[in-house]
Curated annotation (Swiss-Prot):
Coiled coil start-end: none
Residues annotated as domain RNase H type-2: 12-201
Name of the encoding gene: rnhB
PANTHER family linked: RIBONUCLEASE H2 SUBUNIT A (PTHR10954), RIBONUCLEASE HII (PTHR10954:SF18)
InterPro entries documented for this protein: RNase_HII (IPR022898), RNase_HII/HIII (IPR001352), RNase_HII/HIII_dom (IPR024567), RNaseH-like_sf (IPR012337), RNaseH_sf (IPR036397)
Cellular component terms per the entry's GO annotation: cytoplasm; ribonuclease H2 complex
Protein name: Ribonuclease HII
Amino acid sequence: MQIGLDFNLVEDLVAGVDEVGRGPLCGAVVTAAVILDPARPILGLNDSKKLTEAKREALFDEICEKALSFCIARAEVEEIDRLNILQATMLAMQRAVEGLHITPKLALIDGNRCPKLAVPASPVVKGDSQVPAIAAASILAKVTRDREMSAFELIYPGYGIGGHKGYPTPVHLEALARLGPTPIHRRSFAPVRAAWEAREGVTDSLI
């Protein structure tokens, strides 16, 4: 038994659902849904933010190998800008649950809101620190998104995306003001919108 995590919650085809990437200024919001196998326990599950990158990577592979079912889903930047980040996150969570090849009897959602699902769902505040399946989902989502951000570092150099993963750090905000938004920046987010409008103003003044 792992302290702080209730393994009894996985015994009846319960899916844990979590997201990564609501706060960043760029990139998709990534979600995952996981149904763990009680017969194949995974040691060391915890909130992905509390684990080292090496531990997350190792657990990612183990979760994919041992879970009864898992699905990693997303909502793209265009959807975030069109719907807003909350609704886009709910959509991505919905996609993750619908993508499971086994239908869960219950979906436990990290946080205080649930997406509209075809199965019963319940929110669990700080669930990624309490429910093993949610912890597993948080790891799948974070590793997936972090890998994408590292790849974007090569496509859009100068922003430091591989380091801050899109979050509004001073380095990111300075680069955004200096270089302007990229196609993966969320224009509905205030700092990106301000940088975009500033560049449009400069362009207009040159015409």
